[in-house]
């Protein structure tokens, strides 16, 4: 499962259901990872009908709080209320379902 770090503010907004999208810059680093999980074709275009589970972790430690989110992808401008820079184009992860991971 692809794991992506996320800031606490956005983590909490996704967990509460307030934030419905997560944004990642249009960089080769993310393109490769999204291709591997099936959200992007090797041409760089989103596979609209595909959804996959991604782990969003609030920090870099394996013990940091994390969520599993079922996502689909599009390439678009983001919502500035949810952390996107105005007018900038992103990989937009549309969040369909959220599961909080419990640590023992």
Question: What do these predicted regions represent?
Answer:
Residues 1-104:
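Catalytic phosphate/metal-binding cores of nucleic-acid and nucleotide-processing enzymes, i.e., regions
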């Amino acid at each position: 499962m692809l794991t992506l770090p996320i800031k606490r503010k956005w983590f909490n907004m996704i967990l509460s259901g307030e934030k419905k999208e997560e944004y990642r810059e249009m960089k080769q680093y993310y393109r490769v990872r999204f291709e591997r999980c099936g959200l992007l074709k090797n041409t760089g275009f989103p596979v609209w009908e595909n959804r996959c589970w991604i782990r969003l972790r609030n920090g870099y430690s394996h013990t940091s709080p994390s969520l599993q989110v079922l996502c689909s992808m599009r390439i678009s401008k983001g919502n500035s209320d949810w952390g996107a820079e105005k007018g900038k184009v992103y990989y937009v992860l549309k969040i369909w379902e959220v599961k909080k991971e419990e640590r023992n």
